Amino acid sequence: MRRITCLTREDETDCEPEDVLRRIETAKKSAHSVIKEIRKSRDVKRTLKVHMEPWGDLCLHEYRWNLKRVVLSPFRISKGRKIWVYYEGLRRKNISVPEPVFFLEIKVLFVVIRTYIATRWIAEGTKLSQLAAKKDIRPDHFRTILCKCVNAVINLHESGFVHGDLKWSNLLIVPGKDAVVFTDIDALRKTSDPLSQCKDFARIFRPPSRCRLDSGTAEMMILQYLSGRSSLGDPLLEKRLRFYIARQKSRRNDQFL
């Protein structure tokens, strides 16, 4: 038996779940663009830019079931629901992520087979990877942006979260705002484990193709992170952090000067 759960954040959009699902299917057919698509055996993740009334332009994330995951952990919370649940806690901690406007989950018996979560489209933001690729960006200006990114990660970790995929393309810089927006947050999880947080931070030291991170700037970022993380005063933790960063560096030797 199929059961649909739909949650919205605005009173004026109190819609029936079946109606929201119909709107989703219509929006998918006329999507503005496919931002990301991952297809594995019995597992699909898609991110689309769509337009849906009354919300306007949205970033729609679709997750379809994975048989292996269902068998291993049938009662595990879905990625979409996790984003929905975490949002208010993140907002209270001044951690910027795209604002979710609705969440829809389809279950057959007790098994989640499909999840949708829609977030507001951020039109004015630029990915860190796109900024790094600009030839006319001043080095001192880019270092300032990197410092903002490190501060955002410090706040995320001090609040007891790890992002799970801190690629440069998942850090959105919004002009005129101090906040750095974390995107693609379906790997986000709660943990205060310092080793997990060190691994999370180390991922930012693996820049994308054709981008460069000089050793002086990298060291500045490391010291800034350690200074902002009072819980990482243990020299052994600093050693582990540098080990994780060196491992990321070895995967992209040509990206470090």
Q: Which residue stretches match the model-derived regions?
A:
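Conserved short alpha-helix within the protein kinase catalytic core
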Residues: 139, 143-150
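Residue-level marker of alpha-helix boundaries and capping positions
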Residues: 77-78, 143, 212
